[in-house]
Amino acid sequence: MKLDTITKIPKVLGAGIASTDGFVIESQFTVGYNAEKSAAMAAQVVNRIKQSLNIEKVSVIFYTQNSVFFIKETEAGIFFVTCHKDANIGLVKIKINKIT
């Protein structure tokens, strides 16, 4: 998957693909951000939502005080993106939908 398409967007901190059990398959993160923790969190969120809501595919956007997290379940695994809260969220969503 072309992660650099996402990570080239200003204020995107990183992107990656995780397995359903939270292991990193592929990632590109800036220095100081942990791909392993993000992958584990993404897998936990997807698994919890699937279990609670009994649905097939999951796509989630979390807004926090300083960051935005995108999580989308794909054929290749669980795709996740972390960015600053003032990143171009619309552009990030468009790029995610193009490559997943």
Residue map of PLM features:
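Non-catalytic interaction/Regulatory regions outside core domains
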Residues: M1-T100
